[in-house]
Swiss-Prot record:
Summary of subunit composition and partner proteins: Part of the ribosomal stalk of the 50S ribosomal subunit. The N-terminus interacts with L11 and the large rRNA to form the base of the stalk. The C-terminus forms an elongated spine to which L12 dimers bind in a sequential fashion forming a multimeric L10(L12)X complex.
Key words, A-Z: Ribonucleoprotein, Ribosomal protein, RNA-binding, rRNA-binding
InterPro entries per UniProt: Ribosomal_uL10 (IPR001790), Ribosomal_uL10-like_sf (IPR043141), Ribosomal_uL10_bac (IPR022973), Ribosomal_uL10_bac_type (IPR047865), Ribosomal_uL10_CS_bac (IPR002363)
Protein name: Large ribosomal subunit protein uL10
Species assigned in the record: Rickettsia peacockii (strain Rustic)
UniProt cross-references to CDD domains, sorted A to Z: Ribosomal_L10
Pfam families membership: Ribosomal_L10
Gene3D superfamilies: 3.30.70.1730, 6.10.250.290
UniProt KW RNA-binding keyword: yes
One GO term of the biological process aspect: translation
UniProt KW Protease keyword: no
A GO molecular function held by the record: large ribosomal subunit rRNA binding
Function description: Forms part of the ribosomal stalk, playing a central role in the interaction of the ribosome with GTP-bound translation factors.
A GO CC term attached to the entry: large ribosomal subunit
Length: 169
């Protein structure tokens, strides 16, 4: 990389750090081009990205954005995975890493909280924001459904009592 290109590359990484509340740092040594392309396509469908970074530039960008705590994670063949939706991204990366031993999760950061490999794996087991929204809507609808059911049961019970009383007479 030319010296004149380095500030532009640092600025790109700084923008990723600023715009993405969640970043996973990986080692990609041994992944084939088709595997990396497959991962990128999967991430793109979830509005996430995968960027191979030069460690020194990633450290400079981390220091410029106040993410000093992740600077020590940049060693070896490093790529960052970034997204605005942390759980979906974590699920995708963890599943890809399970299927491809050559992708190693090193650590990451979610909403300014540094996570290690195990924390990211645990984090990937959480429900996504859309799943949580669906659960909340379901919980809110459940009482209304029960009230309607009770009202219907009461009216049908009342109708049966009246029918039984009418058939006696």
């Amino acid at each position: 990389m030319l010296r004149s290109e380095k500030p532009v590359a640092v600025e790109d990484i700084v923008n990723i750090y600023k715009e993405s509340p969640s970043i996973i740092i990986t080692h990609y040594h041994g992944l084939t081009v088709s595997q990396v392309s497959s991962l990128r396509e999967s991430l793109k469908s979830k509005e996430a990205g995968f960027k191979v970074v030069k460690n020194t530039l990633a450290k400079i960008a981390a220091n410029q954005t106040g993410l000093n705590s992740i600077a020590n994670l940049f060693a070896g063949p490093t790529a960052i995975v970034y997204s605005k939706e942390p759980v979906e991204m974590a699920k995708l990366v963890v599943n890809f890493a399970k299927a491809n031993d050559n992708l190693k999760i090193i650590g990451g950061i979610v909403d300014n909280h540094v996570l290690d490999e195990h924390s990211i794996k645990d984090f990937s087991k959480l429900p996504t924001l859309n799943e949580l929204r669906g659960n909340i809507v379901g919980l809110l609808q459940a009482p209304a459904t029960k009230v309607v059911g009770v009202l219907q049961a009461t009216s049908s019970s009342m109708a049966r009592v009246i029918q039984a009383h009418a058939s006696k007479n």
